């Protein structure tokens, strides 16, 4: 019922604040960024990016997953939406946004017995996209008994995995090489509002203010 009351409030009051904007969006959209995030209710793309309607093209699924090219048929709607945003809508930026306390990432540390898989077969099948992270985690045994650090590491490895999966598609890789598309990997910390951006050169996640400074200094933002 809360959603209905909220919709009524929007319709009768909040819409008026953006009336001209919505009217301008009646027959066209020109978002500058494709934002791929988890379905988690605590991740609100327009809120954390300070954007208005029409600025973001949003794709959401459990774990902000992009299927690798070798498995694209297992999540055709996701990659088809990515292709549409890039090839037809013409976005110039693409952000993969992971987040803290991610249930999808946390699930790879749990034991998935056959009973659990039988109860939630679709979830079990989807989580298989995150399997490569398990191998990478073996390189960081120091975090195996530290829940918080292991969680952050898993979430960041996942964001990096999805960036690599994106680049397995020719139509994305070509645009990145030709500087027609910029791709970013974010890790959003829910309880603090902090966002960390993946640095492709250092292979570390850095506070976004550092990324902004670097890109402004290189006039590449």
UniProtKB/Swiss-Prot annotation:
UniProt record, GO biological process: carbon utilization
Cofactor: how bound: Binds 1 zinc ion per subunit.
Pfam families named in the record: Pro_CA
InterPro entries: Beta_CA_cladeB, Carbonic_anhydrase, Carbonic_anhydrase_CS, Carbonic_anhydrase_sf
Catalytic activity, reaction form: hydrogencarbonate + H(+) = CO2 + H2O
GO molecular function: carbonate dehydratase activity; zinc ion binding
Cofactor(s) for this UniProt protein: Zn(2+)
Enzyme Commission no: 4.2.1.1
PROSITE patterns the UniProt entry points to: PROK_CO2_ANHYDRASE_2 (PS00705)
Keywords linked to the UniProt accession: Lyase, Metal-binding, Zinc
Family statement drawn from the similarity comment of this UniProt entry: Belongs to the beta-class carbonic anhydrase family.
Name the UniProt record assigns to this protein: Carbonic anhydrase
Organism whose genome encodes this protein: Helicobacter pylori (strain J99 / ATCC 700824) (Campylobacter pylori J99)
Taxonomy of the source species: Bacteria, Pseudomonadati, Campylobacterota, Epsilonproteobacteria, Campylobacterales
Record gene name: cynT
């Amino acid at each position: 019922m809360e959603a209905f009351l909220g919709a009524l409030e929007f319709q009768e009051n909040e819409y008026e604040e953006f009336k001209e904007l919505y009217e301008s969006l009646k027959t066209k959209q020109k978002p500058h960024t494709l934002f791929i995030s988890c379905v988690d209710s605590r991740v609100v793309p327009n809120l954390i990016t300070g954007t208005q309607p029409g600025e973001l093209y949003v794709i959401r699924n459990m774990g902000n997953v992009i299927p690798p090219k070798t498995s694209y048929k297992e999540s055709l709607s996701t990659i088809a939406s990515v292709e549409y945003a890039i090839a037809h809508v013409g976005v110039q930026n693409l952000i993969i946004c992971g987040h803290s306390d991610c249930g999808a990432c946390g699930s790879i540390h749990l034991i998935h017995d056959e009973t659990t898989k039988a109860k939630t077969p679709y979830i079990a099948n989807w989580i298989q996209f995150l399997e490569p992270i398990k191998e990478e985690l073996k390189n960081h045994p120091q975090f195996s008994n530290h829940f918080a650090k292991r969680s952050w590491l898993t979430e960041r490895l996942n964001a990096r995995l999805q960036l690599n999966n994106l680049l397995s598609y020719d139509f994305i890789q070509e645009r990145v090489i030709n500087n027609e598309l910029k791709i970013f990997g974010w890790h959003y910390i829910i309880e603090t509002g902090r966002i960390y951006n993946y640095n492709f050169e250092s292979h570390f996640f850095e506070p976004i203010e550092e990324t902004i400074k670097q890109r402004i200094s290189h006039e590449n933002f």
